């Protein structure tokens, strides 16, 4: 029979029942793993195509129209699918096609002769590259017959002939809206109807991503501005600092850069262990990557470190974005040292956006770490006003950062009138085990707000982070009973923040996680959560306070590092008849942002008589010389006051967070940025310290900068003086762009700045050589 079989085993009939009536069997030539496929004929025996206009002799059987060339139309598909910025699509050597599921992409197929729909049948065979045993049932193997325009079937996948000109076909292929996300291989089988077939294997794999523009996709998000922000924006802001001094820090997500998409898929499949057949499910994928981004269980992307000793790695505060972290991990396949919560969240957001998942980074201030699922955070205080770290298993972080991912939750039935689709909290910081792995989420944010803490996954933990009550107990010794000295129902879960859509400003999303404090709805949600968590705690500890003496902190909240600051406790006697003697212990400690006290800076113990109706104050003045040797990463302090009112059984304890502010790097462009043209810029920093800054270094990332620029200063920066560095970059694309800068030195670290600007399109050149 030669190289083209005259028989065709019709095992799979993709268009049976759709009116086509053409039984097609997906086959493949070359080194296929399917033994029943048909071999591709050697080039020497393929008949020459007829000349244009030739009419085959009625007595001569036409040859199979074999595929000669396939063009995946990178530029056209990149624009249509909003994937043109992926380095895979844009690189000079061996570019790859990246498309989104549920949306047609175009290919141009050149045949060995003109296509005749009366005698020719064409079928596309798509296979998930990582599938060990591709199968139709698991969706890792798909056969799609070519149909005429207007004859689209109701099948999940479709291939439609858009147009034809002689031997060139333009075909629109639509992957299913729930297609597996990952790398796919494409084969094209051609045959004569009722005769044998030959197969063509396209040389390169292509990528299918989630498609939040597709209404049938589980991650569909309506609103172009939202999609531009949460899928396509490669730069964002992550909030750090404290609830009373919010600090926005620029973060380069870099989801389109070299190796980022491949690394994201590696984290899903190899580290996260998601089977190919499950890679279309965003719930399964997000839960897996929340563990894969951290390292304790599976040697994932980032190793956490909260010790303040970062030997052998990069301090978390020195990262400017996700690109270098993920590229280093993908190259070495070892966890990158080191990260803390905002690094884990920034990397997770990058991975999600690279895969096509709408994602945003979210910060909660005064976030509870409730290890006992009690919905309270209990602190024990000794007679010196110190928090007893050895007795505290819970903690309150100055801030905590996680990621929200947008998706429907078909795995959850609606309950109590709530629909659980929308934003889902996903946390990759390794804090607590969930199903025996360090991961958290996806937890429906609406379930958190309603107190539905049993809704998967980890809603109870997220609820406690933003709703737990803070309780302080006075510890007087192992034989003495604990004494309740303060409770705080309002301090946890403040100023929940994310970057605003289309603006480099803060959007407060606290109301998406919780009802207003002390509202009827908020208390109802808390009581529901307490019942569902079977907590032993109740509200019986909410006793009446002693109200004759009112205590209040007065603290300036805009102190630049290098400057002195003062802490004042004001005590007002509200009684018109009774004098009171009060002993006040006031202390200032440096604290890690996780809430753990590091070093004592200064303390004062005084006794004051406060006459009826009078006001007294206790003050501590703290100089730079007092605190600079004790500073830790976030320049955060814990201010604590323990006051004992004599002749009563009342003790007052309060604490507050405070941080000194770092200066900002100023960035200035020299000229108007134009696509494809080299630009110059200047980054400037002023030294706010009373001492010189030595061996300073700038890190720069921006449009067209493939590798982070490191610029070392050759001279010290004297107190009050400025240092500037020049750098160049060439924007590859027009539109909005951002330059991000970091500065570090021994004396002054974790300083950043950014500049957001517009890049003009490349100017067209007319025939005279002038710009049109």
From Swiss-Prot:
Its cofactor is Ca(2+). The keyword Transmembrane does not apply. Its EC number is 2.3.2.13. InterPro entries: Ig-like_fold (IPR013783), Ig_E-set (IPR014756), Papain-like_cys_pep_sf (IPR038765), Transglutaminase (IPR050779), Transglutaminase-like (IPR002931), Transglutaminase-like_sf (IPR036985), Transglutaminase_animal (IPR023608), Transglutaminase_AS (IPR013808). Has an annular, or ring-like expression pattern in epithelial annuli of developing limb segment boundary cells. In embryos, it is seen in gastrulating cells, in cells surrounding rapidly dividing neuroblasts, and in muscle pioneer cells invaginating to form apodemes. A lipid is attached at residues 4-5 (S-palmitoyl cysteine). Its main location: membrane. It is an enzyme of class 2 (transferase). The active site is at residues 400, 427. It catalyses: L-glutaminyl-[protein] + L-lysyl-[protein] = [protein]-L-lysyl-N(6)-5-L-glutamyl-[protein] + NH4(+). Residues 15-57 are annotated as: Disordered. Belongs to the transglutaminase superfamily. Transglutaminase family. This is Annulin.
